[in-house]
Amino acid sequence: MALVCGAPLASRSCLNKSLISSTHELKPLRRTILPTLRWKSATPSINMCLTTSNSVDAVQRRIANHHSNLWDDDFIQSLSTPYEAPSYRERAERLIGEVKEMFESMGPNNDLLQRLSMVESVERLGIDRHFKNEIKSALDYVYSHWNEKGIGCGRDSVVSDLNSTALALRTLRLHGYPVSSDVLEHFKDQKGRFACSSIKTEGEIRSLLNLFRASLVAFPNEKVMEEAEIFSTTYLKEAVQKIPVSSLSRQIEYNMEYGWHTNLPRLEARNYMGDMIHVMPYMNAEKLLELAKLEFNIFHSLQERELKHLSRWWKDSGFSQLTFVRHRHVEYYTLASCIDIDPKHSAFRLGFAKMCHLITVLDDIYDTFGTMDELKLFTAAIKRWDPSATEWLPEYMKGVYMVVYETVNEMAGEAKKSQGRDTINYARQAWEAYIDSYMKEAEWISSGCLPTFEEYYENGKVSFGYQISVLQPILTLDVPLPHHILQEIIFPSRFNGLASGILRLKGDTRCYQADRARGEEASCISCYMNDNPGATEEDALNHIHAMVNELMKEFNWELLKPDNNVPVSSKKHAFDITRAVHHGYKYRDGYSVANNEIKNLVITTVLEPVPL
């Protein structure tokens, strides 16, 4: 029950004899790829049969028969791109200089809105890392004109307007400026409703779109933000049905689809490129667009190199021979490269993908393939943290243990380059807590025990694996994290607890039916219903969705609170990992079965460049 959802516990499981003949001999999976296809499709099912074991007695196992790796290693190694040529980088550098000049050429009538629009555009296009100083200067300027009624379009504006105020509220809050949502009260009518016309002009629709986007960065107990979200959601749903298909309608649909907590920056950049000329008609948007496309494709060339490295790691580690586990390393890398597009952060992206894949492998071992005796041995081996601990492990576990051991130590080496100290003890503590939480779930299933909601939820926040996926990758970033600051990010900090809780709850709402069909009863839904006799499944889901909504607001506060002494970049990366994983659970469990949304994400953000 980790970062991904698996089948039920091993002690009641079985393995297909044709796939693995014994724990000593793993037959390699024969993988092929059709030249006209980028992925293979498969339908998961459950196989039940006996397989031979080390002992005289046969071991009964259950295997979830997950579909094979969709992204063949031969295909990955064959990828090529022309965008590594120096001429593309040289052209991008010239455009960066020209775009910096655009930040300065603004008139007094709409200079506030123009500055906000520039900041928003470079961020949504994924090129903001080149303009950190310009963004800060622009937002300092806007904030200097902010008052209790918001702002107008320009410094000479005598009245505030909703479009500029909503955009400023969201942008300033995301950058840590102390702005109050109370300004929105000034845009209500005498009946306490947000004022709007019945005509729904394009300008008004854009204002309500910015109001909707602002409402998503709400803090706890901000009633006006709740009202803004409800009102703008209803308004935009009606508007998108009436206006013709256009850049505006596409932006409404995208923002209502992904919001903020499931939005991925690189996916948004790809989407926004097609519409930003229409969004910024009063600026030289062509330069921004050309720069964004160049940067997208230059980073695409780096993605290919990193993906080849990851695919070789997956193949050389022997994971391709473990036919009972899910192979989602390409999907995990895609998520990593959708939230961090800084070329210097290769260790972060690859580390996140590797950690997530290890979590998936262990999830399939603990939830599906391993027996209780095997799981106890593996848990003890993790706590010893010594290659000699593999002596008593079954053959298939020996290889997995060594990959975990070597990868975690390798990541600690990368972290030492950034942190200037050995951080392996943090990683070991995280892995021990993670494995212990797995064993607790294994014992619940083995004994037929259904824990209380609170007990399941607290354990599930650890077993989800968020701590493992975050800890070592953020330590590789070029931001020193001394012990007292790191404690505010890692478990059991408030920040980490909120992130883990959100993902555990969201994951369970997407996985519980499939898990229950495979015999695994414990979930937030079943535990809530057991604690509250008479509660229906719908009652449980409503309760959990309400919990998630409140936790999201608290999470916003932990990330954005103005007195935050933790480096923003570190918390932002941890927050973005939450967004990435949450994205996979938007409609269903996108990790057990790689659905079309996940496949398309890989293609549009990693495999395909944009036309220049």
UniProtKB/Swiss-Prot annotation:
The keyword Protein biosynthesis does not apply. This is 1,8-cineole synthase, chloroplastic. Pfam families: Terpene_synth, Terpene_synth_C. It is found in: Plastid, Chloroplast. Binds 3 Mg(2+) or Mn(2+) ions per subunit. Transmembrane segments: none annotated. Mg(2+) 2 binds at D363, D367. Belongs to the terpene synthase family. Tpsd subfamily. One of its GO terms (biological process) is diterpenoid biosynthetic process. Pathway: Terpene metabolism; oleoresin biosynthesis. It comes from the Eukaryota. A motif (DDXXD motif) lies at residues 363-367. Mg(2+) 1 binds at D363, D367. Residues 1-52 form a transit peptide. InterPro entries: Isoprenoid_synthase_dom_sf, Terpene_cyclase-like_1_C, Terpene_cyclase_plant_C1, Terpene_synth_N, Terpene_synth_N_sf, Terpene_synthase-like, Terpene_synthase_metal-bd, Terpenoid_cyclase/PrenylTrfase. The Asp-Asp-Xaa-Xaa-Asp/Glu (DDXXD/E) motif is important for the catalytic activity, presumably through binding to Mg(2+). Its EC number is 4.2.3.108. One of its GO terms (molecular function) is lyase activity. GO terms for cellular component: chloroplast. It catalyses: (2E)-geranyl diphosphate + H2O = 1,8-cineole + diphosphate. Keywords: Chloroplast, Lyase, Magnesium, Metal-binding, Plastid, Transit peptide. Mg(2+) 3 binds at D515. Terpene synthase (TPS) involved in the biosynthesis of monoterpene natural products included in conifer oleoresin secretions and volatile emissions; these compounds contribute to biotic and abiotic stress defense against herbivores and pathogens. Catalyzes the conversion of (2E)-geranyl diphosphate (GPP) to 1,8-cineole. Its cofactor is Mg(2+); Mn(2+). SUPFAM superfamilies: Terpenoid cyclases/Protein prenyltransferases, Terpenoid synthases. Disulfide bonds: none annotated.
